Design a protein with these regions (language model features):
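Class I SAM-dependent methyltransferase SAM/SAH-binding core
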Residues: 27, 35-82
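A short SAM/SAH-binding and catalytic strip from SAM-dependent methyltransferases
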Residues: 91-99
């Protein structure tokens, strides 16, 4: 028997149950190539600032960014240790699959 699990689908389902995302400012730390970022965008936050230390991953995320989310999502190379945002800039912070 083979059971396939989509961890990102389960993750987004759990995140939807936790709180309202509409019109919230979101920081995603460890966004990788942006797969979860794009799913978060469907929850209608005001903005998503997605960071990852991998420059290649950020390039991929920017390349794959659909035009419908271009004004909503901002990708940046960076790490959790060196966040360059003022305090209280975000309503929600997401750390997913970050070690």
């Amino acid at each position: 028997m083979v059971i396939r699990v989509d961890p990102e689908r389960n993750e987004i389902r759990a995140l939807k149950e936790v709180r309202t995302w509409r019109d919230k400012k979101v920081l995603e730390v460890g966004c990788g190539a942006g797969r979860l970022t794009l799913r978060l965008a469907t929850l209608h936050p005001k903005s998503i600032h997605a960071i990852d230390p991998g420059a290649d991953l950020i390039r991929t995320a920017r390349k794959n960014l659909p035009t419908q989310f271009a004004k909503q999502i901002r990708y940046r190379v960076g790490s959790a240790e060196e966040l360059k945002y003022p305090s209280n800039s975000f309503d929600i912070t997401v750390f997913s699959w970050v070690l």
